[in-house]
C-alpha cells in the first residue's frame, strides 16, 4: 500500500523542521514546501529569506525528503498586505498573520499541495484538529503557553479536514529536545517573532514607507491639547511607548496611553493611567465573522474569548441578535483592557476554538457625551 503523501510548510525554523521529521518517522511520504511571501526587501538587512531557504534545504537533506520553493508574493500582496494597509489607513490595527493563515498558508499553499498529489498538508503551528461526529474541530495545543489557535480561527471545515498539526500534542520544550537529538542544523535557531514581512525593523519606519504622515492634535480625554501626533495610522489603542509625552508633567503623573482616535477631526486621544475608563470595555461588536463549524454559537452562549494573542480566555456571553447584519456582540463578565478595532475576537468553548470576527467597536467607560465620537472612529472603514 502506498504511503499517504503530506506536504509540510517549511520555514527554516525549528518547529516546521521537527514537524517534517515527526511525519517522516510516522511513515508518511513527506515533501517540504518553502513559501516565499515577500519580495520587497530581498536585499535588506531585515530579510532572512535566503538563510531560511538554506536552512530548509539542509534539514531536508538530513531527514531525507524532497523540498521545493514556491513564490506566493503576488497572492500575499493582493490578499494580505493590501488589506493590512487599508486597515491602518482607516485608523485600525489589523492582524495580518490571521489573514495570512486563511488566505495563503491554508488556501494558496493547500491548493498547491493538492496539485502535487498530496492528501494532506502540515505546518508547525501549535494547535490540534479533532474529528467529532463528522465535523472537524480546531483545538488549543496541549501546551497552552504556545497555543496558536487564535491565529487559525478563520480555518474552515474543508481546510481542517486536510490539515495536520503534529506539534499540538507535544510541549515546546520537547520540540527543542528532538531538534537537538536528531542534530538538526537549525536546532539552536531562535523562534521568529512579530509580523513576518516586517521582521526586526522599526515598525513605524516600515509603515511610513507605504502610508504618509498626517499630523494632527493630541488631546487628553478632557479635550486639552497636549501635543501633536504624526498620523493616526501610526498609533494603536493602549499604546504607551512612542507617544512623545514621557516627560509631560500634566495630570496625575501616571504614564500616558493612546485612548482613542477620532477620524473626522484627525484627533488622537490620550489618557493617564493603565486602568483609565477610556481603556476598559465590557462590550464589543465584531464583524467579518468566520466560524469553524460553519455557523455561529447560539444567542446567549457563555464562552471564553481572546481579543489579543497570549491573553487568557475572558468569560463572556455571545449575542448576534440586534448586533446588526453579519455582526456579533460579546458582553464580558469583567472589563477588558484596550480592546482594539481591527484585531480579532476569538471565541472558545474550553479548548475548542469556535471562530470569531474582526473587532469593529468597543464600548468603553468614557462619558456618554463622548460615545458617539468614539463610535464613529472605531467603526470607520
From Swiss-Prot:
Give the primary localization class: cytoplasm
What keywords are annotated for this sequence in UniProt? ATP-binding, Cytoplasm, Disulfide bond, Nucleotide-binding, RNA-binding, Transferase, tRNA processing, tRNA-binding
**Residues given in the record as ATP binding sites:** 9-16, 35, 124
* Signal peptide annotation: none
Q: Gene Ontology terms, cellular component aspect?
A: cytoplasm
Q: Any idea of its EC number? A: 2.8.1.13
The record's annotation in InterPro entries points to:
MnmA-like, MnmA-like_C, MnmA-like_central, MnmA-like_central_sf, Rossmann-like_a/b/a_fold
Which cysteine pairs are covalently linked by disulfides here? 100-196
Outline the segment boundaries, as ranges, of region: Interaction with target base in tRNA. Answer: 95-97
> What would you give as a GO molecular function for this chain, any one?
tRNA-uridine 2-sulfurtransferase activity
Q: Where in the cell is it found?
A: Cytoplasm
The annotated active site, in chain numbering, is 100, 196
> Which EC class is the enzyme in?
transferase
* Region annotation (Interaction with tRNA) ranges: 146-148, 308-309
Annotated TM spans: none
Q: Which GO terms describe its biological process?
A: tRNA wobble position uridine thiolation
Which residue numbers mark the site Interaction with tRNA? 125, 343
What this protein is reported to do is described as: Catalyzes the 2-thiolation of uridine at the wobble position (U34) of tRNA, leading to the formation of s(2)U34.
Task: Name the protein family.
Answer: Belongs to the MnmA/TRMU family.
Q: What is this protein called?
A: tRNA-specific 2-thiouridylase MnmA
Amino acid at each position: 500500500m502506498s504511503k499517504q503523501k503530506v506536504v509540510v510548510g517549511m520555514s527554516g525554523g525549528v518547529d516546521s523542521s521537527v514537524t517534517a521529521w515527526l511525519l517522516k518517522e510516522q511513515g508518511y511520504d513527506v515533501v517540504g514546501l518553502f513559501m516565499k511571501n515577500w519580495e520587497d526587501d530581498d536585499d535588506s538587512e531585515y530579510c532572512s529569506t535566503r538563510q531560511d531557504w538554506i536552512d530548509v534545504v539542509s534539514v531536508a537533506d538530513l531527514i531525507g525528503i524532497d523540498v521545493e520553493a514556491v513564490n506566493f508574493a503576488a497572492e500575499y500582496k493582493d490578499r494580505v498586505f493590501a488589506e493590512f494597509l487599508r486597515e491602518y489607513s482607516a485608523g485600525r490595527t489589523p492582524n495580518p498573520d490571521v489573514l495570512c493563515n486563511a488566505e495563503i498558508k491554508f488556501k494558496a499553499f493547500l491548493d498547491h499541495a493538492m496539485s502535487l498529489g498530496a492528501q494532506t498538508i502540515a505546518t508547525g503551528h501549535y494547535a490540534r484538529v479533532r474529528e467529532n461526529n463528522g465535523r472537524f474541530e480546531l483545538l488549543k495545543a496541549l501546551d497552552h503557553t504556545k497555543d496558536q489557535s487564535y491565529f487559525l480561527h478563520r480555518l474552515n471545515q474543508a481546510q481542517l479536514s486536510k490539515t495536520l498539526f503534529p506539534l499540538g500534542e507535544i510541549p515546546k520544550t520537547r520540540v527543542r529536545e528532538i531538534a537537538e537529538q536528531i542534530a538538526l542544523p537549525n536546532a539552536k535557531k531562535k523562534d521568529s517573532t512579530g509580523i513576518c514581512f516586517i521582521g526586526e525593523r522599526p515598525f513605524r519606519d516600515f509603515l511610513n514607507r507605504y502610508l504618509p504622515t498626517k499630523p494632527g492634535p493630541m488631546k487628553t480625554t478632557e479635550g486639552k491639547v497636549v501635543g501633536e501626533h504624526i498620523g493616526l495610522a501610526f498609533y494603536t489603542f493602549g499604546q504607551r511607548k512612542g507617544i512623545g509625552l514621557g516627560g509631560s508633567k500634566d495630570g496625575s503623573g501616571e504614564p500616558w496611553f493612546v485612548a482613542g482616535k477620532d477620524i473626522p477631526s484627525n484627533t488622537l486621544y490620550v489618557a493617564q493611567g493603565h486602568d483609565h475608563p477610556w481603556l476598559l470595555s465590557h462590550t464589543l461588536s465584531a464583524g467579518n465573522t468566520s466560524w469553524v463549524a460553519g455557523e455561529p454559537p447560539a444567542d446567549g452562549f457563555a464562552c471564553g474569548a481572546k481579543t489579543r494573542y497570549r491573553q487568557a480566555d475572558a468569560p463572556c456571553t455571545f449575542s448576534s441578535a440586534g448586533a446588526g447584519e453579519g455582526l456579533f456582540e460579546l458582553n464580558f463578565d469583567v472589563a477588558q483592557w484596550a480592546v482594539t478595532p481591527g484585531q480579532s475576537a476569538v471565541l472558545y468553548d474550553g479548548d475548542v476554538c469556535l471562530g470569531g470576527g474582526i473587532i469593529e467597536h468597543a464600548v468603553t467607560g468614557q462619558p456618554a457625551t463622548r460615545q458617539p465620537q468614539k463610535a464613529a472612529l472605531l467603526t470607520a472603514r
